[in-house]
Amino acid sequence: MKSEWDFGTLIGLLAGVVCIFVAMVWPEGDTPIIIPTEGSGFRWEQLSWFFQPQSVFIVVGGVLCATLVNYPLKAVLGLGKVFKNVILSEKFDFTGMIDNIVVLAEKSRKDGLLSLEAGLSEIDSVFMRNGVELAINERDSSRLRTFLSMDLNNISTRHIGAQEIILYMAAYAPAFGMLGTVLGLIIMMNKFQMSGETSSIDFNVAEQFASLLSGMGTALITTFYGVFFANMVFLPIAGKLKRRSENELMLKNIVLEGIISIHGREHPILIREKLMTFVALSERKMSENKEV
């Protein structure tokens, strides 16, 4: 086996070091000040406390760099497609798929399994189309099940891989948030120490402690962003990917069992009854009411 350079790891390590270095020398801007407002209205001025580009840079940049080190570059670049799938809604019509399988079963039982070959191009599902084509060419039902199960396992493995990347990103985010906070506290304490070395005339204790507390609040913002991205972005996305994967795999399991049943020349009514066991009871009752 030939070894090759993993450029994703190199890019991640170098970019991570640069990210931390930039955070260390980030130019200091004016510290936002809370201006209390009268009455019970919202204090919109307080929002300025939470807009810290440096904090977002450390958390997001650090998470991306660590992910590049942990995973191949190709897998990280594929995250765009993963996030797109999360945003787009996809409906899994289990009963509709069962109806399509029953139609194929009726045609196969009437005209033979080879008659399904003419309608392969009309099947939208790639997994189902490949499965029907395989059923036409494969005589051994056990081998057919093995091939379809292998395909299904490969799909499941890819789904788990995408979920794993997002879960690792969720784990990295609070860690980089804490790293940014520690970095901010170190810079803040050093500034306080340098201020204390000035003459007593220039050194105002009240002002320095006010600056210290203000700087501590700014430093803690990075932890806030780390926790926010982990629990509001990455973990919910990973959970949604898991739910969607479970539904997709169940739909493909229905297809798998349906193709095996068609290959075994089972009666369409028995095929429907068997496949409907995959469907939730409430959805099953809705389907029965439509038929009535």
Where are these regions (language model features)?
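Large intracellular
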Residues: 2-8, 19-164, 247-292
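Helix-termination/interfacial motifs at the ends of transmembrane alpha-helices
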Residues: 4, 11-14, 18-40, 154-244
